[in-house]
UniProtKB/Swiss-Prot annotation:
<dbReference type="GO" id="GO:0016992">
    <property type="term" value="F:lipoate synthase activity"/>
</dbReference>
<feature type="binding site">
    <location>
        <position position="375"/>
    </location>
    <ligand>
        <name>[4Fe-4S] cluster 1</name>
    </ligand>
</feature>
<dbReference type="InterPro" id="IPR006638">
    <property type="entry name" value="Elp3/MiaA/NifB-like_rSAM"/>
</dbReference>
<keyword id="KW-0949">S-adenosyl-L-methionine</keyword>
<keyword id="KW-0408">Iron</keyword>
<dbReference type="GO" id="GO:0051539">
    <property type="term" value="F:4 iron, 4 sulfur cluster binding"/>
</dbReference>
<dbReference type="InterPro" id="IPR007197">
    <property type="entry name" value="rSAM"/>
</dbReference>
<feature type="binding site">
    <location>
        <position position="138"/>
    </location>
    <ligand>
        <name>[4Fe-4S] cluster 1</name>
    </ligand>
</feature>
<dbReference type="Pfam" id="PF04055">
    <property type="entry name" value="Radical_SAM"/>
</dbReference>
<comment type="similarity">
    <text>Belongs to the radical SAM superfamily. Lipoyl synthase family.</text>
</comment>
<feature type="binding site">
    <location>
        <position position="166"/>
    </location>
    <ligand>
        <name>[4Fe-4S] cluster 2</name>
    </ligand>
</feature>
<dbReference type="InterPro" id="IPR031691">
    <property type="entry name" value="LIAS_N"/>
</dbReference>
<keyword id="KW-0496">Mitochondrion</keyword>
<dbReference type="GO" id="GO:0046872">
    <property type="term" value="F:metal ion binding"/>
</dbReference>
<protein>
    <recommendedName>
        <fullName>Lipoyl synthase 1, mitochondrial</fullName>
        <ecNumber>2.8.1.8</ecNumber>
    </recommendedName>
</protein>
<keyword id="KW-0411">Iron-sulfur</keyword>
<keyword id="KW-0479">Metal-binding</keyword>
Length: 423
């Protein structure tokens, strides 16, 4: 009987005696309110869906379609509603990808310090935006050795490209750049108290220089705060403009990283159409030639997107030919239901095989494993030593050159003096 009074939509009418009572009136008013809210909510949904369809229809790029947001079986219309949970893939997650979350990681001083610093300064990290499985390990770090690190993402949290493997938000008109971001990033890095940091960026095709000048300002601000800090920049292709690539390469970086992401054949289906396999290779090759090999270059490959064994091998060869010194290989994991599905889960032994082959090809460093990511902190131990070795070699070379030049100048002075005396 109570539901009969509560719901206005019920076919039976409450009795006159019930309506006359204060409780009955209250129940009747509540029933009307519920009915109005339901009707209003339904109207809002219809209006939202209609506007969403209109926006998709008006898009001229051909990329932002409703079908592009959902993985649909062949023959199924994107307007049909799917009932029940969507499966991530036919294969269950293998045991080597099932991580045990370390208890109390969120209570680690360094983890909390990094998270607090990022929140206060409203900075984005790829660790969170890309849902990296190693966030606890990287942010928690080693309290004694100071190896904690976070990959800071500059130029906002919206990317102008729509790669089908990435969970970072996409927008054709992202918010304008924050002019104070370089200083905010520098302060955040200084508060972390680490000696190695990774800085990445979203692609900003809406900017004439792709954000190259902003990246340089961030790098300079970080290095001014801590000149001894080793800084790795994981950057985009800057529309393939090699002059912009040079602008970033001239900044005081330690490592220039640009990810090729996957093998050439599947690149058009995996990456945004404005990014290409050959363009990425050209960027990496140009950094190496422009800096005469002084800059350490790094790239990354994902497995589980439909690649074949020989294609992975060829990609490693291409990277090495381009002069890349460090490479990482990891398992692609679907970050959301709207992203590409995993084609297969590569076994840890396969990753071990690729690491051995990469080192045999001449790479100075290779991190290869199911949960390895392009900025995985395990790589920084060895990369730090490589950077320091190159820095020491460059210093020694400069010292030798200076000594040689001084000796030559002294010899020339003696010769000139002898000539003058003879005259």
């Amino acid at each position: 009987m109570f539901h009969r009074h509560l719901c206005k939509l019920c076919s039976k009418t409450p009795s006159a005696a019930t309506l006359a009572s204060p409780l009955g009136k209250l129940q009747e008013e509540r029933g009307e309110g519920v009915a109005k809210d339901l009707k209003k909510d339904k109207q809002h949904r219809q209006i939202f869906l209609q506007k969403f369809r209109e926006r998709l229809d008006s898009d001229t790029t051909g990329k932002n379609t409703l079908a592009g947001f959902i993985d649909l079986p062949e023959g199924i219309s994107p307007t049909m509603a799917a009932v029940g949970p969507l499966k991530r893939g036919e294969e269950p997650l293998p045991p080597w990808l099932k991580m045990k979350v370390a208890k109390g990681v969120s209570r680690l001083p360094r983890f909390n310090s990094i998270r607090k610093s990022m929140r206060e300064k409203r900075l984005a990290t790829v660790c969170e935006e890309a849902k990296c499985p190693n966030i606890g390990e990287c942010w928690g770090g080693d309290e004694e050795e100071g190896t904690a690190t976070a990959t800071i993402m500059v130029m906002g949290s919206h990317c102008t490209r729509g790669c089908r493997f990435c969970s970072v938000l996409t927008s054709r008109t992202p918010p304008p750049l924050d002019p104070d971001e370089p200083q905010k990033v520098a302060n955040a890095v200084a508060e972390m108290g680490v000696d190695y940091i990774v800085m990445t960026m979203v692609d900003r095709d809406d900017l004439n220089d792709g954000g190259a000048a902003h990246v340089v300002r961030c790098v300079n601000a970080i290095k001014e705060k801590n000149p001894l800090l080793l800084l790795e920049a994981l950057v985009g292709d800057f529309h393939g403009d090699l002059k912009l690539v040079e602008t970033v390469a001239l900044s005081p970086l330690s490592v220039y990283a640009h990810n090729i992401e996957c093998v050439e054949r599947i690149t058009p289906n995996v990456r945004d159409r404005r990014a290409s396999y050959r363009q990425s290779l050209k960027v990496l090759e140009h950094v190496n030639s422009f800096t005469k090999g002084a800059m350490l270059t790094k790239s990354s490959i994902m497995l589980g997107l439909g690649e074949k064994e020989e294609e992975v091998r060829q990609t490693l060869r291409d990277l090495r030919t381009a002069g890349v010194s460090a490479v990482t290989l990891g398992q692609y994991l679907q970050p959301a239901r709207t992203r590409l599905k995993v084609s297969r889960y590569a076994h840890p032994k396969e990753f071990q095989m690729w690491e051995e082959e990469a080192m045999a090809m001449g790479f100075l460093y290779c991190a290869s494993g199911p949960l390895v990511r392009s900025s995985y902190r395990a790589g920084e131990y060895y990369i730090k030593s490589l950077v320091k070795q190159r820095g020491a070699a460059a210093t020694k070379s400069n010292t030798t050159t200076t000594t040689t030049n001084t000796a030559s100048l002294a010899a020339a002075t003696v010769t000139d003096s002898a000539t003058l005396q003879g005259e």
